Amino acid sequence: MRGTVDSASAVDTDMWGLRTIVADVVAGPQWSTFFSDLLGKRVRLVQARQSAYDVHPATILGSSSVAELARRSGLASVDPRRFRMLIEFSGGTPHLEDSWGGTLLRIGGAVLRGGGPVKRCAATTRDPASGAVDLQTLRLITAYRGRRESELGVGATFGLYCEVLEPGTVAVGDCLRVG
């Protein structure tokens, strides 16, 4: 299927109850019919006019935190891609990032401020390559970390949200400076 973006048909689009963005409707009746039938309710396919993010624009997670999850779960390893973090850093103790709320973080040409914990969702239970549910990450995280408070309520938290104070280029291997 193909469709064109109709910028004359702008709509306000709710982003999970957190904010509203302006988006353009993707023209062509086949799109709305296809997705409406799939979801069992009337929907429209739209394209955001500007980039959008889930809760906060950046997330960070330590590789030692992922290794600790694997160790506590009796697994050889856990693929960190399942957590969809923008930045993964190496070094430090497991869950060191939990202590960075309100702290300035510099990486590459960007400056971030640590926010609150990332409440994980069921998407993390899916293999990043196949999409198949293969690991009960929420249960595994909760088993050793408990359920923790986040801005989205109590749940299995893993990683840290960040605000971007100064945008800049970030590359693999850039040094992360805390404070």
Label the predicted regions.
Residues 1-179:
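Metal-cofactor-dependent catalytic cores
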